[in-house]
């Protein structure tokens, strides 16, 4: 680490109690054109930020008389304790989970004019999903583009499925890279895939028509159903294909993960036959709940009557291709859109449904609310219906929760799968991405920022890796038929992205210089530097600028660019603080996911505690 570039700020405990005079020796005299930039992160992130700062100082900064001094913050430092000091930063970065807190506290300057000013700096095509979350009205909690803007996305980190190509090939899985719309031509050997391979390059695929699936096994695919025979080991002559351009469904990712989990395919020394312990990991439930149109936060009326919705047992609905549907409140839904909670439930105008302790809802005058009668009538039309039914949010959440639960334990009505490590097995010294590049897990859901962390160790561990789309809900007409890829219903493409947001200290006396650095760093030139260091840029058009350490590098990085088009912030961003999230997730992550408490022991108290907490948020929209 370059000690001459940055002077480290005191640790969190000391910083919180420190007065401005205690930092008198840290900063020294600063010229009117020198600004201080506080930063933090992993070693590779820090080197990227230093490179970014150096490049600015050598180019735009030099041309415009601005110098940036980078100051490294230690992990856990309370930056708010420093903002009024003489050594406070002019430019600082915060993640999505604390962004609203900083805006409400008055720590960030309003930079709404930054797009129109400093026209010699190009912002480029920053993804709307990344920047729109940074508009913020502190009174209503809205993020509309007419609301004030307080930061720009320095790091827009979409998520994808990281997978070990080498392990798949070792296990006899053919890895292809063919878009769904191109698969027929690829099967006819008319075109090569995105890795330059034709079907004829794989002798085992002779006479096999690969279906439009993320993971295909030619004889005995696993699917979760009371009628299913359960998981079976692939036979010696079974064809296995993984397509990194098509999202797997819930069954497929579990099928694949079981093959690489010690609990299903035991080898030696507590590992699977392939040397892995587990097959799959996702820390969050987002792409499970969101793909079916659910969420953990429901608005019961569309007017700010908030409720904990993660355990809603009522089915969800999505509009079919070429159709529209008008919801109960008059909202017109287009093809591919899921029906909002307040538009799917039976209720009168302005009626506020009453949540029960199971996760369901009652009418204000008593009795179960149930699905709106117009939706019920629409579904009775069968194939002519404008809607397809999707699983309930509760069902989706339980499917996620089962991943790390013991095979002997129940998640309400079905047993756990034990194909993922529990949170207790993911430590600071052994994070999930380390378990990945050391070959202990086949695949995991991770943010784009982890690409460089993996790339720098991939050569050492012989980890040939790439990325693929996140899991998506898909129900096949006949899940028992390996070649059936016709669907009854498909959920939306879903997943979260996490920003690191760069803004200007509202107390800085160097507002103009600081804003220029923010725009440059988050604009095309700064993001190009970032991409050259192996970090995904906020502008999808810069994806070809990505450069990685080592010889093992991902070829399918376009997945992240595609993800930026639809991924959104996690639940930590929804409200001005995360107290309502902590009301249910701490017990879940500490106890339920670690096998110390059952699902049934958790959910009643989680519902009560969260809904009580949400009563304090009634004045907010979202």
PLM regions and their residue ranges:
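Short, low-complexity disordered leader/linker segments with a strong preference
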Residues: 1-36, 615-622
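Short, well-ordered beta-strand elements
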Residues: 31-42, 66-71, 91
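Short, polar/charged alpha-helical segment
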Residues: 42-65, 160-166, 289-291
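Extracytoplasmic "Venus flytrap"/periplasmic binding protein-like
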Residues: 55-133, 166, 170-171, 176, ...
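Extracytoplasmic/periplasmic substrate-recognition and gating elements
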Residues: 64, 142-147, 405-408, 412, ...
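Hinge/lid segment of periplasmic solute-binding proteins
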Residues: 96-158, 182-218, 224, 318-322, ...
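Glycine-centered hinge/linker elements that transmit conformational signals in sensory
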Residues: 254-261, 300-429
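Long, aromatic- and glycine/proline-rich binding clefts that accommodate carbohydrate-like moieties
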Residues: 472, 479-488, 531-592, 620-622
């Amino acid at each position: 680490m370059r000690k001459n570039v940055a002077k480290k700020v005191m640790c969190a405990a000391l910083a919180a109690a420190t007065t401005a005079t205690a930092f008198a020796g840290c900063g020294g005299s600063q010229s009117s054109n020198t600004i201080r930039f506080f930063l933090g992160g992993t070693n590779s992130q820090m080197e990227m930020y230093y490179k970014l700062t150096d490049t600015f100082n050598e180019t735009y900064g030099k041309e415009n008389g601005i110098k940036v001094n980078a100051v490294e913050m230690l992990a856990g430092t309370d930056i708010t304790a420093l903002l009024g000091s003489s050594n406070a930063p002019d430019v600082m970065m915060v993640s999505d989970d604390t962004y609203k807190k900083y805006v409400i506290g008055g720590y960030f300057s309003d930079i709404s004019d930054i797009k129109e000013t400093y026209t010699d700096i190009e912002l480029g095509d920053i993804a709307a999903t990344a920047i729109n979350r940074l508009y913020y009205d502190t009174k209503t909690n809205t993020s509309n583009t007419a609301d004030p803007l307080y930061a720009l996305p320095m790091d827009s980190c979409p998520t994808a499925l990281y997978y070990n190509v080498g392990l798949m090939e070792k296990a006899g899985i053919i890895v292809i890279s063919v878009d769904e719309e191109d698969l027929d031509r690829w099967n006819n050997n008319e075109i090569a895939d995105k890795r330059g391979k034709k079907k004829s390059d794989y002798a085992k695929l002779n006479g096999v028509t690969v279906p439009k699936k993320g993971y295909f096994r030619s004889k005995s695919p696993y699917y979760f159903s009371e009628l299913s025979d359960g998981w079976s080991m692939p036979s010696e002559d079974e064809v296995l294909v993984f397509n990194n351009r098509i999202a797997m469904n819930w069954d497929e990712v579990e099928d694949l993960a079981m093959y690489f989990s010690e609990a299903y395919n035991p080898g030696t020394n507590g590992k699977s036959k392939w040397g892995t312990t587990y097959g799959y990991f996702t820390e969050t439930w987002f792409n499970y709940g969101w793909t079916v149109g659910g969420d953990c936060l429901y608005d019961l009326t569309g007017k700010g009557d908030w409720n904990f919705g993660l355990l809603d047992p009522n089915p969800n609905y999505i509009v079919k291709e070429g159709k529209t549907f008008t919801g109960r409140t008059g909202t017109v839904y287009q093809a591919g859109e899921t029906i909002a909670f307040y538009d799917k439930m039976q209720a009168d105008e302005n009626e506020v449904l009453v949540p029960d302790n199971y996760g369901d809802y009652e009418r204000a005058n008593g009795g179960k609310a149930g699905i709106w009668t117009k939706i019920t009538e629409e579904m009775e039309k069968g194939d002519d219906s404008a809607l397809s039914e999707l699983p309930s949010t509760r069902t989706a959440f339980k499917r996620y929760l089962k991943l790390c639960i013991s095979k002997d334990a129940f998640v309400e009505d079905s047993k756990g799968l034990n194909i993922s490590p529990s949170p207790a097995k993911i430590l600071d010294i052994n994070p999930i991405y380390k378990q990945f590049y050391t070959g202990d897990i086949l695949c995991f859901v991770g943010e784009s920022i982890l690409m460089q962390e993996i790339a720098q160790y991939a050569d050492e561990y012989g980890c040939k890796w790439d990325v693929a789309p996140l899991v998506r809900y898909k129900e096949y007409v006949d899940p028992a038929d390996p070649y059936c890829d016709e669907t009854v219903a498909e959920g939306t493409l879903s997943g979260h992205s996490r920003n690191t947001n760069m803004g200007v200290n509202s107390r800085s006396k160097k507002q103009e210089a600081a804003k220029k650095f923010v725009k440059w760093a988050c604009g095309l030139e700064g993001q190009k530097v970032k991409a050259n260091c192996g970090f995904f840029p906020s502008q999808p058009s810069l994806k070809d600028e990505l450069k990685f350490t080592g010889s093992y590098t991902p070829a399918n990085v376009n997945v992240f660019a595609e993800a930026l088009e639809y991924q959104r912030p996690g639940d930590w961003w929804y409200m001005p603080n995360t107290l309502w999230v902590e009301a249910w997730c701490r017990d879940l992550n500490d106890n339920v996911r670690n096998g110390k408490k059952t699902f049934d022991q958790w959910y009643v108290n989680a519902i009560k505690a969260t809904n009580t907490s949400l009563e304090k948020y009634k004045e907010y929209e979202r």
